[in-house]
Amino acid sequence: MNFIDKAISMMSPGWAVSRLRSRAVIKAYEAAIPTRTHKIKRENRNANQLNQISGKSLREQARWFDNNHDLVVGALDKMEERVIGAKGIIVEPQPLTVAGTLNNVLAEQIRARWAEWSVSPDVTGQYTRPVLERLLLRTWLRDGEVFSQMVAGKMPGLEPVAGVPFWLEAMEPDYVPMEKTDSTNNLIQGIYFNDWQRPKSYIVCKSWPGFATAMVATKLIDAENMLHLKFTRRLNQARGVTLLAPVIIRLLDLKEYEDSERLAARISAAFAMFIRRSDAMVQDGDAPDYADKDRDLDIEPGTILKDLLPGEDIGTIKSDRPNANLESFRMGQLRAVAAGVRGSFSSIARNYDGTYSAQRQELVEAQEGYAILQDNFIAAVSRPVYRRWLATAITAGVIDVPPDTDMATLFNAVYSGPVMPWIDPLKEANAWRILIRGGAATESDWVRARGGAPAEVKRRRKAEIDENRKLGLVFDTDPAHDPGEQDNAGSEDNSGGDKNAAGDDSRERTRGGRQ
């Protein structure tokens, strides 16, 4: 307190306290001060406490949406297409020789064996690698996390795939019980951690736990053999949370609102009318008796109603359905949903209205979000699986490593997935040509931008050109027989002067005529 506050506190302590309180309020942020119109909502629990309470409920709600909500199904399908794609994560081996050049012999050997193993990589033998990766991604985004055990060596009931004794055992998050927590042993939600919060081992149920987790036998799997892909928004979070958590309420409200509008439209579509009578007919004691008379009227196109009595007319029920504002309201809600799930509005809503520039701008912005999810998947699944598979294949003698290989680069590889689609292929292709000619990109980058593997494309391209030359076939797709670009450029240069001269002559004639 300053001198004035001390003096006031001696005479009126309550006044001094009020002054200090007011000074503290002035220094604080406005958002930190609760008011009648601003109700403060706080979250002071750590990530594990929050997930322990609501994680399972959110996961079950997200699964219900994936089964019953068309918008969620479409959004997750689009995530599969944009993050994993039809061919899965493409792995291009990049081992180098001691001279620093690419070891093409070893790379081709690894690539061939990897393709054979990718036909049936899981323990069930039901999925190819791209299908398994898409299921892992969908489980990760919907449930918040997914587990997969890497099984290597001789195992009863399992046959080596392409000569490599290595498999994947994918598991939903229910197999790692979240109820298993013991602070004395540093066990948090089914995962043992060391003092640095690095996972040591996982408690895994041997069968589907269902509702009776305590009755199911469990096993302990070392962390080095377990892949754990989780979606987190906070540090030091042991288990993942579904991607749909921030938008669950909005999605449920939108579904119920659409159901109500659809039901109202069905009711209004049922044509209804009524017979209106005048008051004079009702009050007249001689009015006809309608009790025994059939008043059902058969109506069809061109019908002339002759059964109406004097003083009666036909009235119809007016309907305001379907709601004219439903489309705009729905689109606004879908924009909010797309922002909450790191997706593209046009892809989720299937609304592709707009100019080329607007569509491409949205693709550019949305692609970064897909790239982040893709990078997380590669870091947690694709890279560990490839490196463990390669080590197992070398140990099993399936792959021979040449003596001139730089062993420090043995596990090097380029991982790539789906890239941003091309709205106008001609514009995109011309842009890539300019980048390559300017030295800002490579031909491999161009091939990857189309979702292909550079080595595979070059191999097939060379075989195609060699076969055409062998058969004496000439197409303009062979650059050796397409000097048209230089001819066009030369003709433009040669004709430029004539065109300019012709233009000058025409302008001179125009000026002469005007004079």
Residue ranges and their predicted role:
Residues 1-97, 508-515:
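N-terminal-proximal low-complexity accessory segments that begin disordered
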Residues 2-20, 361, 376-515:
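C-terminal anchoring/interaction modules
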Residues 66-94, 132-140, 244-264, 377, ...:
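Short, Φ-rich (hydrophobic/aromatic) sequence segments
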Residues 73-232, 435:
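Structured, mid-chain assembly/scaffold modules that mediate subunit interfaces
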Residues 101-108, 305-423, 455:
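Surface-exposed loop-to-helix/strand elements on domain peripheries
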Residues 108-119, 135-142, 146-149, 153, ...:
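A broad, structural surface signal
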Residues 127-129, 151-152, 264-270, 348-352, ...:
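Short coil/turn segments at secondary-structure boundaries
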Residues 227-362, 403-405:
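Extended, charged amphipathic alpha-helical segments
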